């Protein structure tokens, strides 16, 4: 196998990033099925490793402790031919994001603040951790810069139904093949 084939094979994963409620898991499952790839939700891997729900982990070790666990689980994930849906806060985990850039194509599912706010009635119930004095708008603005920094492909889903977003993703992936 030549070097190009090895590189191409290593980068055959798709990693979906974006705000909570943007549809990373929903879109990811369908895209994985259509492309014949495995689907991995890293929040479930974290819960499995820690034997606790995410909110219990955060309550126990705090936001920084959770980010350490999230970084470790995402950084250590070794897989091929998969669609990976990490939690929205993975963009704070530099080692994990560098790993994802090496093993796949990072797809940013982008939606406006208004769209996300409409989908998430209560950020706290959704498990979104806000720092003292931080608003959901602040969190959105902070993360958008990171999503844009790491994205190989950006899919704007404002005004789209889920099926339209899936089609946009598949079209972009086809262009890259």
Annotate each language-model stretch with its function:
Residues 2-11, 30, 34, 144-177:
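NTP-dependent small-molecule kinase module
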Residues 16:
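Hydrophobic anchor at the beta1->P-loop junction of P-loop NTPases
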Residues 22:
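ATP-binding Walker
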Residues 25:
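Walker A/P-loop
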Residues 42-90, 94-98, 137:
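ATP-dependent small-molecule kinase phosphotransfer cores
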Residues 87-90, 112-114, 160:
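Short glycine-rich anion-binding loops that position phosphate/pyrophosphate groups of nucleotides
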Residues 102-145:
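A glycine- and Lys/Arg-enriched "phosphate-lid" helix/loop adjacent to the NTP-binding pocket
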């Amino acid at each position: 196998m030549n070097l190009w084939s090895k590189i191409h094979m290593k980068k055959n994963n798709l990693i979906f990033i974006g705000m909570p409620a943007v549809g990373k898991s929903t879109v990811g499952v369908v895209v994985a099925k259509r492309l014949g790839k495995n689907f991995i939700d890293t929040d479930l891997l974290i819960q499995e490793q820690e034997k606790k729900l995410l909110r219990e982990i955060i309550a126990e070790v705090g936001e920084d402790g959770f980010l350490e666990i999230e970084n470790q689980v995402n950084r250590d994930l070794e897989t091929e031919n998969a669609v990976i849906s990490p939690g929205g806060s993975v963009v704070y985990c530099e080692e994990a994001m560098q790993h994802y850039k090496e093993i796949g194509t990072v797809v940013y599912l982008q939606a406006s603040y208004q769209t996300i706010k409409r989908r998430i009635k209560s950020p706290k119930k959704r498990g979104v951790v806000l720092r003292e004095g931080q608003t959901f708008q602040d969190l959105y603005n902070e993360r958008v810069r990171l999503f844009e920094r790491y994205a190989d492909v950006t899919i704007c889903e404002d005004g789209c139904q889920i099926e339209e977003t899936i089609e946009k993703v598949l079209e972009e992936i086809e262009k890259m093949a």
